[in-house]
Amino acid sequence: MLQRICLWLLLIGTSVVQAHAFETLARSAWVYDVATQTVLMAKNAQTPYPPASMSKLMTINMAFEAMADGRITPETQMTVSTKAREMGGSTMFLNEQDRPTVSDLVQGMIINSGNDACVVIAEGLAGTEEAFAAQMTKRAAALGMRNSTFKNASGWPADGHRMSMEDLGLLALRLIDEFPQYYSIFAQKEFDFADRAPDNRFNRNPLLKLDIGADGLKTGHTQEAGYGLVGSAVQGDRRIILVLSGMDSEKMRATEAEKLVNWAFRQFSLKTLVAAGTPVVQADVWMGVQNSVNLVPAFDVTRLLPAVGASNMTAEVIYGGPIAAPIAAGMVLGELRIKIMGFEETTVPLVAQTDVLAGGMFKRLETVFLLLKKRLFLSNTAQ
């Protein structure tokens, strides 16, 4: 017989909460909690906008992938073309006589926002920047970045060069997860290739100047795009990724980014809804040496919830009972369905906490008697 038992999760020690809403001045924004895969804010997040130098993250990703599959190494030297040398905007001040390593170029793209470095990488990997941009677009689509189209490697203003804030956030997540051996470069404060750019040697990311756990990733600015930032910060067991675009000044970018990081960490906290191994319900056992067995969650269920205010959460236990012996510890016997207003329902397998051996003849007769007695009692109570 299918058993359904409703629980108040407050009895297990937690509650649902209401967060204080945050209104950002950014034209578009995306804020994400990595551990719980929770989007905390999305404002025009899927709309493609000019990304400016934030799109260099895709060029950097392509370089990291090329190193991962052995096409190049950090020590590989690359040729600087006239086109690369003539790039305007932020540069490493490369010239045709240079043979910068891939390591130099990656630092130049991340820290100096070097447009020349992007062209060198593009030509080194694909022959031309145009061919490389086409590869970037194709690769982005394969990675699930549905709203990204690239016309060049640097983010230089070009018709049709677009990325959404969500895509930039997903790209940041990939760089963090897939390339930990290189990710520390994003927190590097300065880089000056051959002592040529003392005024352009500092990382522009304003979050790196603050004591908030920031460790990346990239700023961007053009007249059309406004001021933007892809950032990430770690506090305790949590990592936040944020993407902002379309702000009016460097000061606004820095202020909004700091506010969003603080909001994400202070207004939300990790809560364990149910802990693995904690008895949730005692299920009747049929023909066992014991008359019941505890059902426990197979794993912890942790959710990121707003950290102020409170209201109840409910759960439903579902299992087929009585459960016939023998029963092995860890056997899946039911499920726990957790329901929180505003969140998707979570289903957790319930497993037997202990073994229950099959009983002998007398034990079986005792079990039959006890179960009949229990059902008779419940029937009389219902009347």
Which residues fall in each region the model found?
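Sterically constrained small-residue positions within well-ordered secondary structures
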Residues: 10-12, 20-22, 42, 233, ...
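Residue-level detector of intrinsically disordered, flexible termini
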Residues: 16-20, 314
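Active-site-adjacent loops and short helices of periplasmic peptidoglycan-processing enzymes
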Residues: 19-180, 191
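Domain-terminus/edge residues, biased toward the C-terminal soluble/receptor-binding domains
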Residues: 145-149, 157-383
